[in-house]
Regions:
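Bacterial N-terminal signal peptides
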Residues: 7-15
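Bacterial signal peptide processing site
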Residues: 18-22
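Extracytoplasmic substrate-binding proteins
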Residues: 23-24, 32-39, 96, 106-183, ...
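A short, structured surface patch at a secondary-structure boundary
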Residues: 39-108, 203, 240, 248
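Short secondary-structure boundary segments
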Residues: 44, 101-102, 177, 207, ...
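His/Asp/Glu-enriched short active-site or ligand-binding loop at hydrolase and phosphoryl-transfer sites
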Residues: 64, 187-211, 231
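Proline-aspartate-enriched helix->loop->beta-strand connector
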Residues: 83-102, 117, 215-232
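A ligand-binding cleft/hinge motif common to bilobed small-molecule-binding domains
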Residues: 103-114, 226-243
Length: 293
């Protein structure tokens, strides 16, 4: 449950920061013209994946408890990204720290700044944000061309998924970020965008907020065609139990077996694997087309 709860808190953390600081470029807080970072600690798993995708895995000097790449397993863990070990962070002497843009991380950021580390706080809620953050990381690592290539590759793959799904029926989807209380992806989030790219329609695409909590009554009224529940290995949900759960049992998608558990580490991380997430979504939403390919 710890990893799944962390994923939700992380999404909400960035959402709040984005709402209050959307007009500020996160890159301005690290300064331009500095030497490429060589000793990096990323407290955000999606940013860590981006650093690896840019070819700079060898510059990472630590990982968090939620970094799943086996290539990083040998690195010391600083704990959870929102509450890392300050002692270990300072001991490792990073020249760049990628941190969560929230008030809870302020003490971490302040202390690291005293030691001369640059701090980068990306605010990624949309695919456009992801492109910007990828390019900003590329600039800080001296890998601008690699970043441009990565963005172009992701965009090309997403466009291929969109083209393949064009013209198909668009099932309505209830994407469950967190099960209890039900929390979903609102309009404008990258999940909302990926659902559209994959040929689906976010059943809460008109909800207020980026990651709103919703009532089961509201879900029942909207009767989504498909329910996708994100989960981690340590937070399994027995889908069969939904058939007797209050509210859930009233959904046709539950009664007719259109509930799918999806990997939170893939879908809830706005990083270089978003195209893979879109492809999997398209296969889930249009299984007959996937089988013919």
């Amino acid at each position: 449950v710890r990893a799944a709860r962390f994923a939700l808190i992380a999404l909400l953390t960035v959402a709040i920061a984005c709402q209050s600081e959307r007009d500020q470029s996160s890159a301005t807080r690290v300064g331009h013209g500095a030497k490429p970072a060589q000793r990096i600690i990323s407290l955000i798993p999606s940013a860590t994946e981006t650093i690896v995708a840019l070819g700079a895995a060898d510059r990472l000097v630590a990982r968090t408890a939620f970094d799943v790449d086996s290539a990083l397993a040998h690195l010391p863990s600083v704990g959870e990204g929102l509450t890392p070990s300050l002692e270990l962070l300072t001991t490792l002497q990073p020249d760049l720290v990628v941190a969560w843009p929230d008030n809870a991380s302020r003490s971490v950021i302040t202390r690291l700044e005293r030691f001369g580390a640059r701090i980068y706080t990306p605010q990624v809620q949309t695919l456009a944000d992801l492109r910007q953050a990828t390019r900003e990381l590329g600039d800080m690592l001296g890998l601008a061309e690699s970043a441009d290539s990565l963005v172009a590759s992701i965009d090309g793959e997403l466009q291929a998924v969109r083209a393949a799904a064009a013209g198909r029926e668009q099932p309505s989807v209830f994407y469950v970020v967190w099960y209890d209380p039900p929390t979903t992806a609102g309009p404008g989030t990258y999940i909302d965008e990926l659902l559209q790219i994959a040929g689906g329609r976010n059943v809460f695409g008109d909800a207020p907020g980026l990651w709103p909590q919703v009532s089961m009554e509201a879900v029942v009224r909207r009767q989504p065609d498909v329910v996708l529940i994100s989960q981690t290995e340590d937070s399994p949900i027995d889908v069969t139990n939904l058939r007797s759960a209050v509210g859930w049992r009233e959904l046709r998608a539950v009664k007719e077996g259109r509930v799918v558990q999806v990997e939170a580490d893939l879908y809830n991380r706005p990083g270089p694997r978003v195209a893979e997430a879109a492809r999997r979504l398209a296969a889930l939403l249009h299984p007959s087309h996937a089988e013919r390919r």
